[in-house]
């Protein structure tokens, strides 16, 4: 019976229309800038456009500094390492997030503590975070999901009181605000990504 259902599913695939996650839009300015990179031979991470992007993106997100890296995963790893968290300490992370969040925590010699999400927003449940904070907690990674900011107010107060670092993963809320302040401007560090989602 199951094999028949699988065969039927594969036959139906030809009738489904592919819907891309994102379709890039390139205008004349982008083409001109790419041409300039090729002409000047600056196609690595040190060209003028990278510095310009870092400065403009930092200002846009109400941050003093910004460093471009190759991916959101790389950004998370750099953020975690730069905080010099105590080895084997705990980092609270959302259970509903890209696997990179947990992998970066583990790779940095820390223990991920998974927190379930709020059933209405899919964001990490702030009340559950508060319950899991203990003496071993060194950081909290707050991942904003599907364009909805995490309910930050209580978490930020408790983190400050307990000297817990906050990393904001703001990949899915670029340009959005929480209480009239840019998402990605609340944490000790914030990460962003331009993955197609």
Regions found by a protein language model. Name each.
Residues 1-43:
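N-terminal "arm"/small-domain region of PLP-dependent enzymes with the aminotransferase-like
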Residues 20-22, 70, 141-143, 191-195:
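Short beta-strand segments
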Residues 23, 131, 181-183:
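Short secondary-structure boundary/capping segments
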Residues 46-90, 104-108, 114-116, 181:
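Phosphate-binding glycine-rich loop
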Residues 81-161, 165-170, 177:
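PLP-dependent aminotransferase-like
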Residues 168-197:
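Conserved active-site segment immediately N-terminal to the catalytic lysine
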């Amino acid at each position: 019976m199951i094999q028949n259902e699988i065969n039927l599913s594969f036959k139906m695939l030809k009738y489904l229309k592919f819907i891309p996650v994102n379709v890039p839009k390139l205008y004349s300015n982008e083409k001109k800038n790419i041409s300039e990179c090729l002409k000047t031979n600056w196609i690595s991470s040190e060209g003028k456009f990278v510095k310009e992007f870092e400065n403009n993106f930092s200002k846009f997100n109400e941050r003093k500094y910004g460093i471009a890296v190759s991916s959101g995963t790389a950004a998370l790893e750099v953020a975690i390492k730069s905080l010099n968290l105590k080895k084997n300490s705990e980092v609270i992370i959302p259970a509903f997030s890209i696997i990179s969040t947990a992998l970066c925590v583990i790779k940095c010699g820390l223990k991920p503590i998974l927190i379930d999400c709020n059933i209405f927003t899919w964001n990490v449940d702030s009340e559950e975070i508060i319950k899991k904070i203990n003496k071993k907690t060194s950081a909290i990674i707050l991942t904003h999901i599907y364009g909805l900011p995490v309910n930050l107010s209580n978490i930020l107060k408790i983190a400050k009181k307990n000297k817990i670092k906050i990393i904001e993963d703001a990949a899915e809320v670029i340009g959005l605000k929480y209480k009239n302040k840019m998402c990605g401007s609340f944490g000790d560090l914030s990460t962003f990504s331009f993955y197609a989602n």
